[in-house]
Amino acid sequence: MKSATTIFNEWVKKNKDDGMQKTHTPAVMDMLQYSLSPLHTTFSFIDAGCGNGWVVRYMNNQSMCETAIGVDGAIEMINKAKRLDTEGQYILSDLMDYKPKKKVDLVLSMEVFYYFSNPSKLLNHIKEHWLRSKGRLIIGVDYYKENQGCHNWSENVGTPMKMLSRKDWVDIFITSGLSNIKHWLSCPNNDFIGTLVITGTVS
């Protein structure tokens, strides 16, 4: 099997990242609506696993977003993000190695966490090194046990993925010590039970 970053580098060359953007948009907009609606002051933002940077570009157009940063481990994704947005902040780094110069108010991650063999370790790293006090982490995953349609993805894509149940994902957030944990299934339809969204805040 190949590493996830190798797969994503190949996908950029085939423009598959554009399809990912299209399919991820509804759930990401739901996640952002939930995260941003309570905010009444300026905030800072990181997209953990930013791909071609489309969420960062969107956030940079939000009047209250003072800083938006995209971090990704796939060089071709970061290169494309920089081509599409020459003034944006896009950083090539393994998420486990990255520590922002300043902690931020909101970290979003869509379809990323299950590519890590130890998602709880990544969550704790983000909690400790990325998020300010009262800051929020919100993630979305389509690869989880209750979604029967995803069970062959790892074999079909050719990269390792961590299969966890909905309860497992929620337990990771609880064990991390994050507060105000919420979870729901976003944007279900006749063929898909929905993106599993989990969120929590730093005390």
Each model region followed by its residue ranges:
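Class I SAM-dependent methyltransferase SAM/SAH-binding core
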Residues: I46-A48, N52-D97
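Conserved beta-strand signature within the Rossmann-like core of class I S-adenosyl-L-methionine
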Residues: K134-D142
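Conserved S-adenosyl-L-methionine
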Residues: L178-N189
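A short glycine-rich, Lys/Arg-flanked "PGG" loop and its adjoining helix->strand segment in the class I
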Residues: S120-K134
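Short alpha-helix
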Residues: M161-S176
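Short, glycine-/aromatic-enriched active-site segment of Class I SAM-dependent methyltransferases
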Residues: D142-P160
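A conserved beta-strand element that flanks and buttresses the S-adenosyl-L-methionine
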Residues: L108
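Conserved class I S-adenosyl-L-methionine
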Residues: M1-P38, K145
